[in-house]
């Protein structure tokens, strides 16, 4: 039994809809379904309703600062159920904004956040280690997965143009759709004419906040 609390943005609504769609496939019952607005600064009313439900865990479908407010309010109303966030808050900024309340929160994220925790044989390790080092040296701030997405998008395009031997749109498109085994910061990309995302669930690691930092759930 799971409770949902979701924001009102496009990402939030999309995730909320997908959660409702897939929950029955995994035998999950959504027993509470609360929402909050983009300008809301207090979600204790929604969380108090969730506390009174029969939920065994809570999932926050949110992006931006909303999930940090949810996390702080979550502890304030005395909720002790497992709290899961989305990859939409996969950055150190979320931990900073949430403070000690973030301890124990879990969320799926790309390997870019935890290169030092990857096995040496992991194909992403050299890629994400170098990106994190170079990004933080250049910008003097913690790396986040969002910059990594932009980097991957650019490098996939460059790779496709090189393989196409041209900047002709149709040829570049065909080259992109034939991308196989591209190791990026967000995962190993395998595209096709029907799959322009190119990633599967192996692109995500389940992370947990411990002592104000990321740890891997094994």
Question: Where are these predicted regions, by residue range?
Answer:
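Extracytosolic ligand-binding ectodomains
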Residues: 1-218
